[in-house]
Amino acid sequence: MTVQTFTPNQTTTLDTAKKTIEQQSQELTPSGGNKIGFVSLGCPKNLVDSERILTQLRTEGYEIVNSYHDSDVVIVNTCGFIDSAVQESLDTIGEALKENGKVIVTGCLGAREDEIREVHPGVLGITGPHAYENVLEHVHQFAPKPEHNPFTSLVPDHGVKLTPKHYAYLKISEGCNHRCTFCIIPSMRGDLVSRPVGEILSEAERLKNAGVKELLVISQDTSAYGVDSKHSLGFANGSPVRQNIKALSEELGKMGIWVRLHYVYPYPHVDDLIPLMAEGKILPYLDIPFQHASPNVLKAMKRPGRAERTLDQIKKWREICPELVIRSTFIVGFPGETDEDFEMLLEWLKEAQLDRVGCFKYSPVEGAAANDIDDQISEEVKQERFECFMLVQQEISAAKLQKRIGSTMKVIIDEVDEEGAIGRTYADAPEIDGLVYLNGETSLKAGELVDVLIEHADEYDLWGSLVRA
């Protein structure tokens, strides 16, 4: 066991994150205090919660270790979004109990305490998501707070990070105001609560000063940032800043590093972000989960959007910012999805020509309203539709990447080994999108930004050579 993450990948896998997490644990100064093992599962938003807990534990003098057997207590930060994630969480809790015996559970699955207790009655304590203080209380109970000189800092200014040093997730809000019928996030994390803009920008500045070259802005609903405060004025560095996603993006764009927006809900005011991308202030990359194209399915999901309107919106965005890359996610096999609905989705996909796409087969989630919808789709039909959908998108992706051949692109290096370097362009987020391979380039370092001549492409990835000055 190590301090680790589990993130489902939709296209390709990169081991950088786990390696860096192991290195992070080794690089932390030993404190001599009680030792904590930590397992972080699920999405980047959960990863940020783990970073916050670990930062506080280090501040209090606890030591973070890499094995079950060396730990006085093991914390498992769980995911409970879909059935496979629930099973992953329960299996991990069971492994920690078997190997160590003293386990504290937190995270999204922690909101369903009875379900955990039924399978694993021996856990020491259970808390829901972002219940940081409750987690620490459980730790204090079973691994007393070490005697620690408060004037000896065990934590870097930017806190403990579970990502490689050159990129970091920046969470701007918690919770969600939407009630999509396939989702139970609001029941676990509550309604949307935005962080003060000054607090976000201060964290971003600390991360930049620590060497971060890429900020990945995340939340449950990034484009709704500030709606809970009615987009009131906040302050950053003594200057007023409106608490909305456009103003926040403008401020982040002044830092001179890559800024990538994730989980952007398809509101009309997303239009305001595109000029910032066209001007080079933030990356021309939009992660926007459309989920489907059929009006009937979208209505059943309680999702916004009409197929023709979103297509017009995408066309308008690309006219303003031709370099724009759009990533999206979709659900096939949603209850009540007819053959006609699915064909409509495929036609929309062909028309939209999205750059990066993830697809999920609908999976019932305990507590989700969609479970009560009539006409559940068989697993066989779900699989057929999934394969058909991904084949269509694979052809789109391959054609788009072929057009990159012969161009020179800026690439951020993620990993270097004895065979060469692996990086990403602005079009690719870590863990979920494609990669750029530079065979033989063993002298580069993670975090470097280099120019690469693209020479080859497949359905998801690129190969190229370094452009030397």
From Swiss-Prot:
The reply on keyword Protease is: no
Q: Which residues bind [4Fe-4S] cluster 1?
A: 43, 79, 108
Per UniProt, subcellular location reads as: Cytoplasm
Q: Which InterPro entries match?
A: Elp3/MiaA/NifB-like_rSAM, Methylthiotransferase, Methylthiotransferase_CS, Methylthiotransferase_N, Methylthiotransferase_N_sf, NA-bd_OB-fold, Ribosomal_uS12_MeSTrfase_RimO, rSAM
Question: Which reactions appear under catalytic activity for this entry?
Answer: L-aspartate(89)-[ribosomal protein uS12]-hydrogen + (sulfur carrier)-SH + AH2 + 2 S-adenosyl-L-methionine = 3-methylsulfanyl-L-aspartate(89)-[ribosomal protein uS12]-hydrogen + (sulfur carrier)-H + 5'-deoxyadenosine + L-methionine + A + S-adenosyl-L-homocysteine + 2 H(+)
Recite the UniProt keywords alphabetically: 4Fe-4S, Cytoplasm, Iron, Iron-sulfur, Metal-binding, S-adenosyl-L-methionine, Transferase
**Residues that coordinate or bind [4Fe-4S] cluster 2:** 176, 180, 183
Which parts of the sequence belong to the TRAM domain? 402-468
Which co-factor is required? [4Fe-4S] cluster
What protein family does this chain belong to? Belongs to the methylthiotransferase family. RimO subfamily.
Q: What does this protein do?
A: Catalyzes the methylthiolation of an aspartic acid residue of ribosomal protein uS12.
Name by which UniProt lists this protein? Ribosomal protein uS12 methylthiotransferase RimO
